[in-house]
Amino acid sequence: MLPELRVLYFEDLEVGLTEILKKEISSSDVVGFAEITGDRNPIHLSEHFAARTPFGTRIAHGLYTAGLISAVLGTRLPGPGAVYISQTLNFRAPVRIGDIVEVKVEVAELIPERRRARLACTCSVGDEVVLDGEALVKVPKKEEADPLAMRMGGGRA
């Protein structure tokens, strides 16, 4: 299920503002990601192969998990109109088929003169952090609002 769109502008942001997305990782998600990217490493696609690895079973692509951060940034915090500038990623643990990943994005710093927000990003499975990092995004001001984004996202939630 896709997250509902929410449009936030730079003026709406404050340090500590947080958004959370939860996603159960399915085999079809992993296969689809492999097809789209061409990363057909058998650790993601073959249970037989993966059983002989230290993980013991198939795991999701690390960048698939990281892509869930992009889902939050593009749809909820800050949402449509935000432009990704950079992202750091630390892969801490594997994500397995059937795991429920909780993605947490939190505003860590606002840089008003450039309309940028630094965001702390964490992906967890249960109590275990599987991925963390930091994103830098450029956020539009209200006066730059795109009427289409407003209609799609319904404005500020």
From Swiss-Prot:
GO terms for molecular function: (3R)-hydroxyacyl-[acyl-carrier-protein] dehydratase activity; 3-hydroxyacyl-CoA dehydratase activity; fatty acid synthase activity. Disruption phenotype: Cells lacking this gene lose the ability to grow on C1 (methanol and methylamine) and C2 (ethanol and ethylamine) compounds. InterPro entries: Fatty_acid_synthase, HotDog_dom_sf, MaoC-like_dom, UPF0336/Enoyl-CoA_hydratase. One of its GO terms (biological process) is glyoxylate metabolic process. It catalyses: (3R)-3-hydroxybutanoyl-CoA = (2E)-butenoyl-CoA + H2O. The keyword Membrane does not apply. Pfam families: MaoC_dehydratas (PF01575). CDD domains: R_hydratase. Its EC number is 4.2.1.55. It is an enzyme of class 4 (lyase). Signal peptide: none annotated. Keywords: Lyase. One of its GO terms (cellular component) is fatty acid synthase complex. Residues 22-120 form the MaoC-like domain. Involved in the regeneration of glyoxylate from a molecule of acetyl-CoA. This is 3-hydroxybutyryl-CoA dehydratase. It comes from Methylorubrum extorquens (strain ATCC 14718 / DSM 1338 / JCM 2805 / NCIMB 9133 / AM1).
